[in-house]
Amino acid sequence: MPPMKAVLQLSIHEERIRKKAFVTVSRCPGVTSITMDDKTGKMTVVGEVDVPVIVMKLRKLCNTELVSVEVVKPPEKKPEPEKPAPPKPAPAPAKPAEIVAWPVQMNNPYQYNPAYANSYYQPYGNSRFVTDESNCVIM
């Protein structure tokens, strides 16, 4: 989604609601900058934002109308003239790689074996008494 510039008309009459509007818009993901003109009540939001979501959230605070939405074009970069590369220094003669001997880790004298994790109880033995009586009383 390209960066957008949205101009919103808000009807704000109190400082408290103005602050809530700023906080609500600033919490939306992708907002780059927020400006507001107190005389006209227009708020300008710039960034990669979902404009209808911002309008829905602001309508819970005050009367909000969407004035315009524009795609912000990135500033054009002027091509810089190429500078001549400085001459490369002569390569240094190859040195043999240093061998570093790391100390061998010995057992810590205060290292204890971990305790067994007996955090459960053994279940009681369940048994069923099944009687296999094949004699029939009715017949």
UniProtKB/Swiss-Prot annotation:
Query: What PROSITE patterns does the record tag this protein with?
Result: HMA_2 (PS50846)
The protein here is known as: Heavy metal-associated isoprenylated plant protein 13
Q: Which residues cross the membrane?
A: none
Q: Which domain of life is it from?
A: Eukaryota
Lipidation sites, kind S-farnesyl cysteine, are C136
| Its job | Probable heavy-metal-binding protein.
Spell out the family assignment given in the record's similarity comment: Belongs to the HIPP family.
Q: Which InterPro entries match?
A: HIPP, HMA_dom
Conditions for induction: Up-regulated by cadmium.
Q: Which organism is it from?
A: Arabidopsis thaliana
Domain HMA, first and last residues per copy: 3-70
Q: Which residues form the propeptide?
A: 137-139
Family annotation (PANTHER family):
COPPER TRANSPORT PROTEIN FAMILY-RELATED (PTHR45811:SF80)
